């Protein structure tokens, strides 16, 4: 930080200094403006005893404020670039993990055959669970549709298709899925299928699930991994969000992925 002084000799030396300018940075622009303002001062102000006072308080405050704004802007730009590079590395690492490779063949809650290619051209948020889940699945689906609603409310953003795939095909047939998804979002799509079809889709996304022992009422709990998956319009797995991530955090992440998306198929 440069210190202003009342000494005429020191002030003369200070006025002769040429600030270093970093081309292309906001900090450099602030230093340019500082130098220009100093050159516009003309004769130094004098105090009661004829001693040079340097620039007035208002000018010094203006210079300090502009210099601080330049540094703040440069810091924000560096932070945004760092976040972009981190997201790029994360996306590449997830793709190398080969999550979501291959196709799946299931039935939606209206009885129509569905495969992964049906969602090409759309952003998709996908969750694996089961309709008899007492608490976690409803909470995660509510969070998922909250993200969808937040993004729907922003003009200019493409729509996001919410998808719920069962890991309990024994109980979650087409009718059960239809009753269940209607309580969350009008566009939430429920998918089910045979035991083999569900296992194939779950395995593709590295979803673990295991049905527990049945009680006297033939009821049981399915233990399964908990994550919301994001697929881009190319149908590629792009990111996932664990239970600890809030709807706001997921929405922010989806926005960033949308802004950075470039199709590899076109």
Swiss-Prot record:
Membrane topology: Single-pass membrane protein
Secretion signal, residue range per the UniProt entry: none
Pfam families recorded: SCO1-SenC (PF02630)
Molecular function GO labels: copper chaperone activity; copper ion binding; protein-disulfide reductase activity
GO process terms (BP): eye development; in utero embryonic development; intracellular copper ion homeostasis; mitochondrial cytochrome c oxidase assembly; muscle system process; respiratory electron transport chain; response to activity
Binding site for Cu cation: 133, 137, 224
Main location: mitochondrion
Compartmental location: Mitochondrion inner membrane
Alphabetical UniProt keywords: Cardiomyopathy, Chaperone, Copper, Disease variant, Disulfide bond, Leigh syndrome, Membrane, Metal-binding, Mitochondrion, Mitochondrion inner membrane, Primary mitochondrial disease, Transit peptide, Transmembrane, Transmembrane helix
Keyword presence, Metal-binding: yes
TM stretches of this protein: 61-78
Domain Thioredoxin per the UniProt entry, residue ranges: 85-259
Residue interval of the organelle targeting sequence: 1-41
Disulfide bonds listed in the record: 133-137
GO cellular component: mitochondrial inner membrane; mitochondrion; myofibril
Gene3D superfamilies the UniProt entry points to: Glutaredoxin (3.40.30.10)
Ranges per topology, Mitochondrial matrix: 42-60
Assigned protein family: Belongs to the SCO1/2 family.
Subunit and partners: Homodimer. Interacts with COA6. Found in a complex with TMEM177, COX20, COA6, MT-CO2/COX2, COX18 and SCO1. Interacts with TMEM177 in a COX20-dependent manner. Interacts with COX20 in a MT-CO2/COX2- and COX18-dependent manner. Interacts with COX16.
Illness the protein is tied to: Mitochondrial complex IV deficiency, nuclear type 2: An autosomal recessive, severe mitochondrial disorder characterized by hypotonia, global developmental delay, hypertrophic cardiomyopathy, lactic acidosis, gliosis, and neuronal loss in basal ganglia, brainstem and spinal cord. Serum lactate is increased, and laboratory studies show decreased mitochondrial complex IV protein and activity levels in various tissues, including heart and skeletal muscle. Most patients die in infancy of cardiorespiratory failure.
Function, in words: Copper metallochaperone essential for the synthesis and maturation of cytochrome c oxidase subunit II (MT-CO2/COX2) by facilitating the incorporation of copper into the Cu(A) site of MT-CO2/COX2. Could also act as a thiol-disulfide oxidoreductase to regulate the redox state of the cysteines in SCO1 during maturation of MT-CO2/COX2.
PANTHER family hit by this protein: ELECTRON TRANSPORT PROTIN SCO1/SENC FAMILY MEMBER, PROTEIN SCO2 HOMOLOG, MITOCHONDRIAL
Protein name: Protein SCO2 homolog, mitochondrial
Naturally occurring in which organism (per UniProt): Homo sapiens (Human)
């Amino acid at each position: 930080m440069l210190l202003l002084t009342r000494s005429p000799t020191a002030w003369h030396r200070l006025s002769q200094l040429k600030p270093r300018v970093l081309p292309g940075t906001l900090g450099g622009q602030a230093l340019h403006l500082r130098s220009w303002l100093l050159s516009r001062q003309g004769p130094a102000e004098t105090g009661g005893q004829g001693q040079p006072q340097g620039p007035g308080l208002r000018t010094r405050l203006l210079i300090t404020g502009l210099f601080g704004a330049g540094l703040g802007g440069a810091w924000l730009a560096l932070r945004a670039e760092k976040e972009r590079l981190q997201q790029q590395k994360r996306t590449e690492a997830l793709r190398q993990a080969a999550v979501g490779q291959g196709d799946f063949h299931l039935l939606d809650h209206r009885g129509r055959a569905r495969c992964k290619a049906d969602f090409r051209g759309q952003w998709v948020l996908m969750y694996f669970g089961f309709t008899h889940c007492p608490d976690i699945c409803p909470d995660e689906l509510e969070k998922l549709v909250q993200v969808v609603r937040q993004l729907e409310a922003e003009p200019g953003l493409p729509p996001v298709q919410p998808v719920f795939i069962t890991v309990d095909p024994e109980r979650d047939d087409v009718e059960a899925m239809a009753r269940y998804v209607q309580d969350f979002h009008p566009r939430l799509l429920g998918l089910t299928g045979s035991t083999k079809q569900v296992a194939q889709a779950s395995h593709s996304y590295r979803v673990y699930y295991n049905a527990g022992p049945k009680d006297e009422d033939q009821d049981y709990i399915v233990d399964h991994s908990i994550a919301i998956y994001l697929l881009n319009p190319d149908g590629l797995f792009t990111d996932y969000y664990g239970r600890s991530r809030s709807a706001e955090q997921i929405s922010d992440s989806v926005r960033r992925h949308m802004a950075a998306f470039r199709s590899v198929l076109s």
